[in-house]
A protein has these predicted regions:
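Glycine-rich phosphate-binding loop plus the immediately following alpha-helix
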Residues: 60, 137-178
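Short beta-strand-loop/turn "lid" adjacent to the catalytic site in phosphate-handling enzymes
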Residues: 46, 53-56, 71-105, 133-141
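Phosphate/pyrophosphate-binding loops at sites that engage ATP/ADP/AMP, CoA/4′-phosphopantetheine
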Residues: 67-80, 219-231
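Gly/Thr-rich phosphate-binding beta-strand-loop-beta motif of the actin/hexokinase/Hsp70
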Residues: 23-45, 118-135
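A short acidic Gly-Thr/Ser loop motif
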Residues: 31-35, 86-87, 124-128, 151, ...
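Short glycine-rich, Thr/Ser-proximal phosphate-binding strand/loop in the N-terminal lobe
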Residues: 26-62, 66-69, 140-141, 145
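Glycine-rich phosphate-binding loops at beta-strand->alpha-helix junctions
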Residues: 88, 224-254
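Adenine-nucleotide phosphate-binding core of ATP-dependent small-molecule kinases
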Residues: 190-222
Length: 254
């Protein structure tokens, strides 16, 4: 059942060529992560026709069905060839007998195709984080362990502590004035750092920026482990559109 990206592309092309005799064939990409489900529908020229994502709250099949319904509502009945990726996708792929592409393979292939100048990719997921180095055709991946410190779940926990969400945390962080040291390796340790600061009157703006800085520190120390982040850097994953990417960029080298 495990497929490489090349195998998936070859099977998709073969299937699509066969189906083109009757109708157009579209590709459906499904990414099932630890906290969200993402789908994208592309035509035979790699143009996006539909894309969306939702948090699944452990209801993966129901969430996927909802997203597929939205796609059908927009595009109508179409012939598709699906491929599944993501940390939570293998079981569903086996159950549905759908090709599965390991997420690092999928990410690396996508970047080498659509952003070939990428030297380093930093991806923060719901419960995992990874750095991918592209060096002379070689791909080196570094991933966090079993702890979700410094990931999207960590940001959600910290946002809840400040009675907001990740987007609200981002808005607060835009106006920070001071930065505090907060541990990101563990949500429990981070809470013990933040609660005294709250009691002492630290602003939500400063705490929010400090939380994002903690994520950066965890990425640098826990994943890069001293290896330089230089050149063209791609930021991937749900948490990175918020302030963390802006704080992280100064750590990369030209």
């Amino acid at each position: 059942m495990f497929q490489t990206e090349d195998n998936c592309e070859e099977k998709a092309a073969t299937r699509c060529r066969r189906d083109m005799t009757m109708n157009k064939c579209y590709r459906l990409g499904i990414d099932i992560g630890s906290t969200t489900v993402k789908i994208a529908v592309l035509d035979d020229e790699n143009h996006f026709l539909f894309s969306d994502y939702e948090r699944h709250f452990a209801n993966i099949q129901e969430t996927l069905a909802d997203l597929l319904t939205k796609a059908v509502d927009k595009l109508g009945p179409i012939d598709i060839y699906p491929v599944i990726t993501g940390s939570g996708g293998l079981t569903l792929a086996q159950y549905l007998d759908v090709p599965f592409a390991q997420e690092v393979v999928a990410v690396a292939e996508a970047l080498q195709t659509y952003a070939p100048q990428t030297d380093v990719a930093i991806e923060l997921g719901g419960e995992d984080a990874k750095i991918i180095y592209f060096e002379g055709g070689n791909v080196e991946q570094r991933m966090n362990g079993i702890c979700a410190g410094g990931t999207g779940s960590f940001i959600d926990q910290m946002a809840s502590l400040l009675q907001t969400d990740a987007t609200g945390l981002n808005e607060y962080a835009k106006n920070y004035k001071s930065m505090y040291s907060i541990a990101a390796r563990c949500g429990v340790f981070a809470k013990t750092d933040i609660q005294p600061l709250i009691n002492e009157g630290a602003t939500k703006e400063d705490l929010s920026a400090s939380i994002f800085q903690a994520v950066v520190n965890q990425t640098i120390s826990g994943l890069a482990c001293g290896k330089p982040i230089r050149g063209h850097v791609a930021f991937l994953g749900g948490p990175l559109p918020v302030r963390a990417s802006g704080v992280l960029y100064p750590y990369s080298e030209p």
